[in-house]
Amino acid sequence: MKRVTERQKGMLRLNAVVNHEVYQTYYKRICECETDRVFCCHQMNHLLDVARIAYIKNLEEGLGFDKELIYVAAVLHDIGKSFQYRQQIPHEIAGERIARRILDSLPTGFTFTDEEKALICLAVRGHRRRHEHMKPIEELFYESDKRSRMCLSCMAEKKCNWNEEEKIWR
């Protein structure tokens, strides 16, 4: 029998989320919607960039969030994007619902506590716009999401509808 190390166990819940049938369904819809998109996309490269930036900021600022929680929130933060493209439903609202559905149906042994689920859903819901009284997890994901974008070298930057505050790299 192969022994699972502590390091390998560290991301098993992340794998359970990414391999979840509901996640795969909505992730594929995003990919379909963005096939010919010239602006920033919301696929795995972006999701993992957000995760890495958030984790670095978490360490630098001593926020104390768990690494796996950050990565799970990152892969879920744009999961509602196809609803924004197809039905004009803000992706953070649709995404929070989808995230909750996934988190509530993970197999035994891969579940999150209620507190962890609440933090992940707050990151998904609060990452899009800066607002007064942001919680640390919302601020972390707002900043990480914006910093993940390469506006400085983007060929479509002039046509982009992001305001100057959002174009942090500019």
Question: What are the residue ranges of the model-derived segments?
Answer:
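Metal-dependent phosphohydrolase cores
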Residues: 1-170
